[in-house]
């Protein structure tokens, strides 16, 4: 199987061709190297050691677990686990619900994220900052500071 880096580079280059139609993207979910890369990108992030509803964490991730995920993808039996619900405090003193995914589901989501980002990232505008590579609240605020000179007020909302 091709390396994930080569696949992602190829997907990105095809995204530049207007009207290109991708075929069989699903087969990339059968590549164990994608899961290794996803594990490397996800393992060290804060909060990812929290056990999901299945009680498993990234500490217990191994090749056998990845093979099991891939086999369930191949025979179309993969089914994400329900999120474990917990509540975290908000600034206003209320609680916000937070869903904790299982580590297997986080891994699959990261693989899918890499694939979809390589295809669609270049289509987003420079003013879009949420959940994008090398973008954050800080980059959004920096852009506001540069482009919104003279603005006297903003409206804040909680969606």
Please report, for each region that a protein language model flagged, where it lies by residue.
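Non-catalytic, polymerase-adjacent accessory regions of viral genome-replication enzymes
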Residues: 1-67
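Conserved pre-motif C helix in the palm subdomain of viral-like polymerases
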Residues: 95-124
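Amphipathic alpha-helical blocks
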Residues: 60-80
């Amino acid at each position: 199987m091709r390396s994930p880096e080569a696949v992602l580079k190829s997907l990105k280059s095809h995204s530049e061709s207007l009207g290109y139609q991708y075929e069989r993207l699903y087969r990339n979910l059968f590549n164990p190297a994608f899961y290794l890369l996803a594990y490397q990108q996800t393992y060290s992030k804060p909060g990812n050691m929290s056990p999901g509803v299945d009680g498993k964490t990234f500490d217990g991730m191994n090749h056998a677990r990845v093979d099991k995920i891939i086999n369930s993808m191949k025979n179309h039996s993969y089914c994400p686990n329900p999120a474990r619900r917990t509540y975290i405090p908000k600034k206003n003193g209320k609680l916000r619900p937070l869903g904790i995914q299982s580590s297997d589901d986080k891994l699959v989501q990261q693989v899918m994220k890499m694939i979809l980002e390589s295809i669609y990232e270049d289509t987003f505008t420079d003013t879009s900052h949420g959940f994008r590579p090398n973008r954050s609240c800080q980059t959004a605020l920096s852009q506001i500071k540069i482009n919104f000179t003279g603005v006297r007020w903003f409206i804040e909302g909680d969606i």
